[in-house]
């Protein structure tokens, strides 16, 4: 809308029929006057200024006590966290059709290949499929030695025992215990006091300890005070300390405290303050791994995770492309590549991101948005002419400075590092494109390096076709437009043959066909090209001057082709361009001249 750009005055409101003058009424429309023009400017839609019922909402988070929080003084994240994929549980439970056993198995192996070393594989007590999946991984020896599986359970004795039972024979695993702690759930769902909620958590810890005491494998405890962000900080600290004291971890095998933004409630910096408060007040901090588990309800899961890492978070749970309940979990791919783009190795192999997206879509039935950070089909695409020109010049600069840090305009990282290409994924051609992007595409994909003026003309031709057809053009279509417009044109004049003699100057005889009639022209000049040019001028009375010529090889090798570009200026002052392609560079220049002349005659 353009109206906010002007100073306006409101004359009045049209009141809903039946409303009293001076009383309360819904605004149907405002008439505004443009103070520059003085006339009625725009009518505004009904109820534009306020949503109903805003008064029933309030801030439902609990900020920690005021203190000096140091995370805000840290400029960047210096190393990658421990990653834990929860795709097979948190992500899978949010799917319309959850993955079957075979899909889960394939997805687990795929996560291992990407480099995940902690993977939550399910809720074994929730269903037979979940239980059998865990057993399949263990019994078929599908868990790599450097990978730890994680299973989740609420703090209920029967469910805990069934969960731990599923781990029989596992070399190492994480048992993830949770119970809700937020003020809302204590009051509305469980009707329990703080002390009773702590007792539930501790009883769960004791049950796990009892079960794993008879197991041979190594079991690490993870505890989540579910809805941490809606829990009073002092109570969150108290229940975390109580769990740590009950479990008695060591520095060698610490307990994982997973501080989940189960539902995002605040600005990201509040979550960071909550994390740092726990980080700096825990009793046995050296025996604890602080884990983050942000959700994306407010669209800020990435920011929460990154600020949470600055605030002391050492581990992050999330999913590929942010799959999960409601608006999803934090996207581990975006987090990892944010680190990568700052020169920090994320420890995950995302070098073929299109394949990762394909596997994700096939396994989950979900789709990756074309604008999803890093993984979307269009995230590196530039349609705008000015953007394409800047990218093309930036990429050219990099070829001249190959050891410089990546700093190409509009590209946060090198698309080739994640399995994308400049020609197919970056420079995209439509009616908004410019000569820079089109020229870059032609040069780097097809080896065609047009003169600057020709490149500008060709850019307008391509944009016009895209605009007329109202669609994007593929690179092959752009190349075909170039060929059809410029290369070896044979109408209205068809070049049949030519030969030369050299006696101080070059003499040429040119055989050609014009509208079905054959001609033979002769001419002479200082060079072959000059001789043919003079033959055309004299023999067909074609007037042109100010010839521009450029040529280069299209390929390498003894049988490579050359391409030539010729521009001629008519008496009208307009320049006409043509191109010739041939294995002989001299012949290519002659064909280019004929192409330019044919375009002049067809104008």
Residue ranges and their predicted role:
Residues 43-157, 426-429, 433-435, 439-441:
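N-terminal capping/small domains of soluble enzymes
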Residues 49-89, 343-522, 558-561:
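A mid-to-C-terminal "edge-of-domain" accessory segment
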Residues 83-86, 119-121, 145-153, 173-177, ...:
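Hydrophobic faces of well-ordered beta-strands that scaffold small-molecule active sites
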Residues 101-114, 157-186, 190-222, 226-285, ...:
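Alpha/beta enzyme core
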Residues 130-151, 202-211, 274-290:
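Alpha-helix-loop-beta-strand connector modules within alpha/beta enzyme cores
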Residues 266-397:
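Catalytic alpha/beta core domains of metabolic enzymes, predominantly
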Residues 508-512, 554-577:
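Positively charged, aromatic-enriched nucleic acid-contacting surfaces
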Residues 574-577, 581-603:
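Mixed-charge, glycine-accented linear interaction segment located at domain edges/termini
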């Amino acid at each position: 809308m353009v109206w906010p750009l002007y100073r306006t005055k409101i004359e009045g409101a049209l009141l809903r029929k039946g409303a009293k003058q001076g009383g309360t009424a819904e605004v149907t429309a405002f008439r505004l006057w443009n103070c520059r023009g003085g006339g009625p400017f725009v009518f505004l839609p009904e109820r534009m200024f306020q949503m109903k019922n805003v008064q029933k909402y309030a801030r439902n988070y609990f900020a920690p006590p005021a203190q000096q929080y140091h995370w805000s003084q840290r400029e960047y994240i210096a190393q990658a966290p421990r990653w834990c994929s929860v795709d097979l549980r948190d992500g899978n439970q949010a799917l319309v059709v959850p993955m079957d056993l075979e899909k889960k198995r394939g997805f687990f192996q795929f996560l291992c290949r990407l480099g995940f070393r902690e993977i939550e594989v399910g809720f074994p007590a929730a269903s037979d499929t979940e239980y059998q999946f865990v057993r399949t991984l263990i019994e078929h020896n599908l868990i790599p030695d450097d990978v730890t599986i994680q299973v989740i359970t609420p703090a209920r004795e029967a469910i805990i025992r069934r969960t731990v039972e599923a781990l029989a024979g596992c070399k190492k695993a994480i048992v993830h215990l949770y119970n809700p702690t937020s003020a809302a759930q204590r009051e509305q769902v469980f009707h329990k006091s703080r002390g009773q909620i702590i007792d539930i958590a501790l009883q769960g810890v004791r049950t796990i300890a009892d079960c794993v005491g008879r197991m041979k494998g190594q079991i690490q405890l993870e505890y989540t005070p579910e809805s941490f962000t809606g829990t009073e900080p002092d109570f969150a600290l108290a229940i975390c300390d109580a769990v740590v004291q009950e479990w008695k971890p060591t520095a060698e095998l610490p307990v994982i405290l997973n501080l989940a933004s189960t539902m995002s409630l605040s600005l990201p910096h509040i979550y960071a303050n909550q994390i740092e408060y726990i980080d700096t007040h825990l009793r046995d901090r050296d025996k604890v791994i602080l884990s983050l588990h942000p959700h994306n309800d407010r669209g800020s899961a990435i920011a929460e995770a990154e600020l949470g890492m600055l605030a002391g978070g050492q581990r992050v749970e999330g999913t590929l492309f942010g799959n999960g309940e409601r608006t999803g979990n934090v996207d581990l791919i975006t987090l990892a590549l944010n680190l990568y783009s700052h020169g920090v190795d994320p420890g995950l192999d995302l070098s073929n991101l299109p394949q990762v997206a394909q596997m994700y879509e096939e396994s989950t039935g979900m789709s990756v948005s074309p604008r999803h950070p890093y993984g979307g089909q269009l995230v590196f695409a530039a349609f705008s002419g000015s953007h394409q020109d800047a990218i093309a010049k930036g990429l050219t600069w990099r070829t001249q400075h190959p050891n410089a840090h990546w700093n190409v305009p509009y590209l946060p990282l090198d698309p080739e590092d994640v399995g994308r290409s400049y020609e197919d994924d970056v420079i995209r051609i439509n009616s908004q494109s410019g000569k820079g992007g089109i020229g870059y595409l032609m040069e780097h994909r097809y080896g065609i390096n047009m003169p600057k003026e020709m490149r500008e003309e060709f850019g307008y031709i391509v944009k016009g076709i895209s605009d007329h057809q109202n669609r994007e053009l593929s690179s092959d279509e752009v190349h075909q437009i170039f060929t059809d417009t410029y290369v070896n044109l044979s109408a209205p004049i068809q070049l049949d043959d030519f030969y030369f003699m050299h006696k101080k100057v070059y003499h040429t005889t040119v055989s050609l066909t014009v509208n079905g009639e054959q001609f033979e022209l002769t001419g002479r000049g200082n060079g072959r090209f000059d001789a043919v040019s003079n033959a055309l001028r004299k023999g067909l009375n074609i007037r042109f001057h100010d010839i521009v010529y450029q040529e280069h090889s299209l390929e390498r090798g003894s049988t490579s082709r050359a391409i030539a570009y010729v521009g001629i200026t008519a008496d009208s002052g307009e320049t006409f361009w043509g191109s010739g392609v041939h294995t002989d560079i001299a012949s290519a220049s002659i064909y280019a001249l004929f192409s330019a002349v044919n375009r002049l005659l067809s104008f």
